[in-house]
Amino acid sequence: MVGDEELAGLSRGERIELLRSRMGAPKLSTTSILQAPPELGQLLPQGGLARQAVTEIADCPALIVELISHTTAAGGHVGVVGWPELSLAGVSEQGNLDRVIVVPDPGVDPLGVAAVLVEGLDLVIVRSTGQLSPVRARPLLAKLRGGSAALVFVGVQIASPAARIGATVSTFRGIGPGRGRIQGLDIHVHVAAKGHRPMQGTMTVGRRAELRAV
């Protein structure tokens, strides 16, 4: 895993070269879909996230960690840009942290960092705020089309993404009256994908993973 300690003090060019050097592993697949966890895949067209395309996902860390765990456990490589407080402890339990590149502080050009990562990884997650105009998005999307990554924006709005996924934690599992510890989470998920009717369901991560489609 690449973190702040390796990027500290490096110029933008040096950061890019370091990131490029860590992307020599083969991609998970050349198919057009990055398979999602089965319980989420039931709601998504063809069971996963579109490669060479953008998906917007709500700011739900538990769902993002589940995506990272599933992708790395299947042999894929993941990049996370601009999310220093995201805990990857769950990935070490179910996935493979050695297949994760983390750039907590991408500096003034997070899209430039993401553009490097989408050329060689399977899943790239960018967390920021605001709306991304077509002009600003164009260079990144050009790089995305040249690779095979699925690009996920968290907290960023972009015109016409392949899918928008809303996610809200609805239940904490394992906690009784005044005691216990969290062993799992129920997440209500809503998916709106191009060319498909909206889908929603409740996904449990942690102790038990299942989906009750609505």
Each predicted region: which residue ranges?
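Hydrophobic/aromatic beta-strand patches that form the interior of the parallel beta-sheet core
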Residues: T55, G79, I101-V103, V152, ...
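Glycine-rich, charge-decorated loop segments at or immediately adjacent to ligand/cofactor-binding or catalytic sites
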Residues: L88-S92, Q157-T171
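Detector for small/aliphatic-rich hydrophobic stretches
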Residues: M1-V80, K194, V214
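Short, charged, surface-exposed secondary-structure boundary motifs
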Residues: P110-A114, A162-A163, P177
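Long, charge-dense
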Residues: H77-L141
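C-terminal functional extensions of proteins
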Residues: V169-V214
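Long, charge-dense, solvent-exposed interaction surfaces that engage phosphate-rich ligands
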Residues: L132-R136, L141-K143, S148-A163
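Short glycine-/polar-rich loops that comprise or flank the Walker A/P-loop
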Residues: G76, L97, G120-L121, G147-A150, ...
